[in-house]
Amino acid sequence: MELQFRQPHFSDALLLLLLSNLLLWEKASSIPACMAEKSGCWNPRMETFDSAIRKAETLRTVSKQFYVELYHNQFSSGKFATLTSKLVRRDEIVFRAASHCHSTLTNPPNKGIQYITIEIPEYLKTLINYVGAWISPLFHLVIELSAMKDVPETILSKAKEIEENNRQILRDLRWIITEVYPTSKKKEIFPSWELLSFLKSSSRNSKFLAMFNLSHCLEYDTQFFLFHLRILKCRITGKDC
């Protein structure tokens, strides 16, 4: 008995094509977003996180150097020695300058396991405000230091590098939240720095009190910038956990 083979109908071929395309689409949708590169797959989210983390590492290092420089450079060492002496004697104004950081008003998850329990969108918004809290103080620090005739280049250059890296980290965080949560409301609330008027004062004592506060808080905050960026990268991308 001769077997009869049915010629494929045009509609059957079209159905097969549609099914094939559907399977390809489902497979593609399960792969993390990336862009074709000669060396492989480029993931813009990963690249932006890595970029922000590198800047945060630089920011941390330069902030520590800036802190040490202000204590040892002839430009500021005398003023900082006087402020340290007052701090030991629990002078109220100096004690607050050394212990109160305006950035804490953003309520960063720096205690316990808050960084694990906080929702990711809220975590991103909080970190944006935490980093953003330094935009104005650092901008004015560079302006005021640039206007001081006796400021050493080593101090001024570090201030500029700190300001630039902080600004770029904020830019990266804004890109990430827009990319990951495009419909999320992105209300930014940057707390004001209470010692800004001291920094802009004509009194050198007031200026150095403001720098005393700024250097202490930066030395503290920058380690948490780096910590939170690494945690967020893990929680959002699942990499480097």
Swiss-Prot record:
Disulfide-linked positions: 34-41, 101-217, 234-241
List the expressing tissues.
Expressed specifically in the placenta. Predominantly expressed in spongiotrophoblast cells.
CDD domains linked: prolactin_like
Q: Which residues are glycosylated?
A: 213
Keywords per UniProt: Disulfide bond, Glycoprotein, Hormone, Secreted, Signal
Point out the signal peptide segment.
Answer: 1-30
Task: Name the SUPFAM superfamilies for this protein.
Answer: 4-helical cytokines (SSF47266)
Q: Which GO terms describe its molecular function?
A: hormone activity
Extract the InterPro entries matched here. 4_helix_cytokine-like_core, Somatotropin/Prolactin
As for family, the record states: Belongs to the somatotropin/prolactin family.
Its name, as the record gives it, is Prolactin-8A8
Q: Which organism is it from?
A: Mus musculus (Mouse)
As recorded in Swiss-Prot or TrEMBL, the protein's gene is named Prl8a8
